[in-house]
A protein has these predicted regions:
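Compositionally biased, low-complexity repeat tracts
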Residues: 9, 20, 46-47
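Bacterial N-terminal signal peptides
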Residues: 13-24
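Bacterial N-terminal signal peptides that target proteins for export
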Residues: 2-15
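N-terminal type II signal-anchor transmembrane helix
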Residues: 7, 23, 32-33
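Acidic, low-complexity Ser/Thr/Gly/Pro-rich repeat segments typical of extracellular/periplasmic
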Residues: 28-355
Length: 355
């Protein structure tokens, strides 16, 4: 269901709407104005669907008073809703005071603005001028972004790389559409299969590209997402460095806060889990730290307190799973304790009372 607008404590503030854009994927058109119902409807209408809604939403009207008798979940023969542009669908009572219009699949168009009319006078005794309740809503325009994780290299297959990530949408998209969007290949035009998995979040899909072979030299894996199969006019490209085989080196380090606060260090090869990392990796600004090795990644966990600067020192003596030393020391400074960016792609709306 879409955003439901609720009645404020004062009639004058009945349907004042604030659209809060959490990320840059809202597509409200400035030449189409939202319909703000009059406060005169306050005694009769408690809530309605409005603002920015999902393409899979239903449209609801919640009355302030229960109807004496309704046939729940049975389609109404006479549809009390009308829309511009026109929408096909069915109408049901879902409770004694809430009526719902269910659009046909695919009827709501991404980015479209709709004006709705609910024939309030069919259910409540009102003045003639209030017999029709007019409202509006917009359908979330589709967009997406790709987020890739650091590469994974295992001790059992040190010459193979796995790339994982997530593709995040502004609205619900079918898995078969996502599968047609993503491709991956190298400069040698080799194509790699991509496994797509639905996550617990309805607008996010995980992807995995495995058995990417290391070559004699570094090369770039190109991941391309074309939105056309999902009706999205957007393309995104991501380049992932695939390190050369037999080349153990430090790749990158990022601040993390999950599962605990710390730093994630990524190497080109799996790190030996038989060595003591104390003295080989240290953060001078913290009094104590805990190390965890996961294949080619080392996690350093610690409490930061009120620190505004961190230094990560990586000693050249660190060895990979084949006992080859790193050979070069590194010192990385984190001047600001910024974590990995958390990107949200949703639009929400809320009702504000009169000031």
């Amino acid at each position: 269901m879409g955003q439901i607008k609720t009645r404020c404590s004062t009639a004058a503030g009945l349907f004042l709407i604030l659209l809060t854009v959490i990320a840059g994927f809202s597509s409200c058109k400035s030449n189409q104005k939202d319909i703000i119902p009059s406060a005169e409807y306050a005694p009769y209408v408690n809530a309605y669907t409005g603002g920015v809604i999902s393409q899979n939403s239903t449209i609801r009207i919640e009355l302030t008073q229960d109807q004496p008798m309704v046939d729940l979940n049975q389609e109404l023969k006479d549809n009390p809703f009308s829309f511009s542009p026109s929408l096909k669908g069915k109408t049901y009572w879902v409770s004694n005071n809430t009526i719902e219009f269910v659009p046909e699949e695919g009827a709501l168009k991404p980015g479209a603005f709709y004006e709705g009319t609910f024939h309030l006078g069919d259910f409540v005794d009102v003045d003639k001028k209030l017999e029709e309740f007019n409202f509006s809503f917009r359908v979330q325009e589709r967009n997406f972004s790709i987020h890739t994780d650091p590469i994974t290299v295992t001790a059992t297959q040190p010459d193979q790389v796995t790339v994982t990530g997530e593709i995040r949408f502004s609205d619900v998209v079918k898995k078969e559409e996502v599968e047609k969007m993503l491709t991956a290949g190298s400069e040698k035009n080799k194509s790699y299969p991509i496994e797509i998995t639905q996550t617990d979040h309805p607008t996010r899909y995980a992807f995995s590209i495995s058995q990417i072979t290391k070559e004699a030299e570094d090369y770039q894996l190109e991941i391309t997402a074309k939105g056309n199969p999902a009706g999205i006019d957007h393309t995104q490209n991501e380049s992932i460095l695939i390190p050369a085989k037999n080349s153990f080196r430090f790749l990158s380090a990022v601040r993390i806060d999950q599962p605990e606060n710390g730093i994630e260090i990524i190497f080109s090869d799996p790190v030996s889990n038989t060595q003591d990392l104390k003295g080989l990796i240290d953060v001078p600004e913290v009094s104590s730290s805990i190390f965890q090795i996961k294949e080619n990644k080392v996690f350093v966990y610690f409490e930061t307190g009120k620190l505004n600067k961190l230094t990560l020192n990586i000693h050249e003596g660190i060895r990979n799973s084949q006992d080859k030393p790193l050979g070069t020391s590194h010192s990385i400074s984190f001047s600001e304790l910024n974590l990995k960016p958390q990107v949200e792609m949703a639009t929400s709306a809320a009702i504000l009372p009169d000031s």
